[in-house]
From Swiss-Prot:
Its EC number is 3.4.21.92. The lineage of its organism: Bacteria, Bacillati, Bacillota, Bacilli, Bacillales. The active site is at residues 98, 123. Belongs to the peptidase S14 family. Keywords: Cytoplasm, Hydrolase, Protease, Serine protease. It catalyses: Hydrolysis of proteins to small peptides in the presence of ATP and magnesium. alpha-casein is the usual test substrate. In the absence of ATP, only oligopeptides shorter than five residues are hydrolyzed (such as succinyl-Leu-Tyr-|-NHMec, and Leu-Tyr-Leu-|-Tyr-Trp, in which cleavage of the -Tyr-|-Leu- and -Tyr-|-Trp bonds also occurs). HAMAP family: ClpP (MF_00444). GO terms for biological process: protein quality control for misfolded or incompletely synthesized proteins. This is ATP-dependent Clp protease proteolytic subunit 1. It comes from the Bacteria.
Length: 193
């Protein structure tokens, strides 16, 4: 069952019913609670652009509980976060892995957070290839470039040497919230709003 909860709010004109995500959007909160695919990316990008149009000065809050997903979909979100004027605060609630972790560490500096029992995981991009040898070679080169670019981004955002990042992302590298803070992925571990 995938029922979306509704909340009822009292207004001057009576009661108003919202699905919970629309109500959170009123408070400038966007939630990524699934694998990152094109549909999720389109929804998050639309919400980011809408909130910027509503008020370009107020921060936006991106709550992340995601195993990652498509790099192209993830970059659509990340590039939009960088494009818009408002700062995007990020918060890991549960799990931020792969591109979920990249979105987490791409929040505004000083505004990247994790809840105490969160887990963060970074690794190299995954991919596969089939076809003729030339096609496989093209795909391999693309994945290696993507790996380098992602490692460079992690190093820049965390302050870690690229050599350490390259070593750590050779495999799934899991961190607790406190370890992610020490690594530079988040700025603080929060227990209260």
């Amino acid at each position: 069952m995938n029922a979306i909860p509704y909340v009822v709010e009292q207004t001057k004109l009576g009661e108003r019913s919202y699905d919970i995500y629309s109500r959170l959007l009123k408070d400038r909160i966007i939630i990524i609670g699934s694998e990152i695919n094109d549909q999720v990316a389109s929804s998050v990008v639309a919400q980011l652009l809408f909130l910027e149009a509503e008020d370009a000065e107020k921060d936006i809050f991106l709550y992340i509980n995601s195993p990652g997903g498509s790099t192209t979909a993830g970059f659509a979100i990340l590039d939009t976060m960088n494009l818009i004027k408002p700062d995007v605060q990020t918060l890991c609630m549960g799990f931020a892995a792969s591109f979920g972790a990249l979105l987490l560490l791409s929040g505004a500096k000083g505004k990247r957070f994790a809840l105490p029992n969160s887990e963060i995981m970074i690794h190299q991009p995954l991919g596969g290839a089939k076809g003729q040898a030339t096609e496989i070679e093209i795909t391999a080169k693309r994945i290696l470039k993507l790996k380098h670019d992602i490692n460079k981004m992690i190093a820049e955002k965390t302050g870690q040497p690229i050599e350490r990042v390259a070593h750590d992302t050779e495999r799934d590298y899991f961190m607790t919230a406190e370890e992610a803070k020490a690594y530079g992925i988040v700025d603080d571990v929060v227990t209260k709003k």
